[in-house]
């Protein structure tokens, strides 16, 4: 049997911008963090331009697109304003996510089933512009099937509930959530979708999920930025890459 396809690491730099914005000014610079992550082995950079601009700002996206040597993944809500901005930036990819101003971080997956009327045209516009679109969704069959129906090239499976259950020591819930991810990744791949995953991943959970051969990209940020305070960003990227490689070595294509 053949080995699983290569697994990409997208490093999310949002919380470098969170730290910068705590005092204002330009330091620490998210672009510098992107350079460091790429030098350490990141395959791409992810940044979320939220409507309230709480961390990443418009100018950050422009600078990232202009200056980094790896693909830029532009996370965004599917609003008219954000679509306009993304089409102007022309990133390699966009990831459409749900967004509420009162949340601390993205709390759940996108309701693709309930928002087909607005998401379909947005996906079509990005496809026409040559920008790969992924939809950040729970590993739910109806959501996955609708994503394929809308001709989204990719999905990103929300791993937060699984990671939270592991952190909370709830083995039963963790197993239930893992089975959903396992089945969802297989269903998405069989539907012709490229499969990514992210949210709440640390070294251990990244290693585990890397065993799933259908998944070709992980987008990870908060854990690595937190660890970087103690050991440096380059070291955290290398450690995450090593964890993913250990998991991938156990995976073989079905």
Swiss-Prot record:
InterPro entries in UniProt: Aldolase_TIM (IPR013785), PyrdxlP_synth_PdxJ (IPR004569), Pyridoxine-5'_phos_synth (IPR036130)
Binding residues annotated for 1-deoxy-D-xylulose 5-phosphate, in chain numbering: 14-15, 50, 55, 105
Cell compartment(s), UniProt: Cytoplasm
Biochemical pathway: Cofactor biosynthesis; pyridoxine 5'-phosphate biosynthesis; pyridoxine 5'-phosphate from D-erythrose 4-phosphate: step 5/5
Pfam family, one: PdxJ
HAMAP family (alphabetical): PdxJ
Protein name as catalogued: Pyridoxine 5'-phosphate synthase
Species name: Rhodopseudomonas palustris (strain TIE-1)
């Amino acid at each position: 049997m053949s080995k699983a396809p290569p697994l990409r690491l997208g490093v999310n730099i949002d919380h470098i911008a969170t730290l910068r914005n705590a005092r204002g000014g330009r330091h620490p610079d998210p672009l510098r963090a992107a350079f460091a992550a790429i030098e350490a082995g990141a395959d791409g950079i992810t940044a979320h331009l939220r409507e309230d601009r709480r961390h990443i700002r418009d100018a950050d996206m422009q600078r990232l697109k202009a200056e980094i040597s790896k693909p830029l993944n532009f996370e965004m809500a599917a609003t008219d304003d954000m679509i306009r901005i993304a089409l102007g930036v022309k990133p390699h990819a966009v990831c459409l996510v749900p967004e509420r101003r009162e949340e601390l971080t993205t709390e759940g997956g996108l309701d693709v089933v309930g928002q087909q009327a607005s998401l379909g045209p947005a996906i079509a516009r990005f496809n026409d512009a040559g920008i790969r679109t992924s939809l950040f969704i729970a590993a739910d069959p109806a959501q996955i099937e609708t994503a394929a129906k809308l001709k989204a090239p990719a999905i990103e499976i929300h791993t937060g509930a699984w990671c939270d259950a592991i952190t909370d020591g709830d083995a039963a819930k963790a197993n239930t959530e893992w089975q959903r991810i396992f089945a969802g990744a297989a269903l998405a791949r069989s539907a012709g979708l490229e499969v990514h995953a992210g949210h709440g991943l640390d070294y251990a959970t990244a290693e585990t999920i890397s065993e799933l051969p259908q998944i070709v990209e992980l987008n990870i940020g908060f854990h690595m930025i937190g660890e970087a305070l103690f050991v440096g960003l380059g070291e955290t990227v290398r450690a995450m890459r090593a964890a993913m490689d250990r998991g991938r070595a156990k995976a073989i294509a079905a």
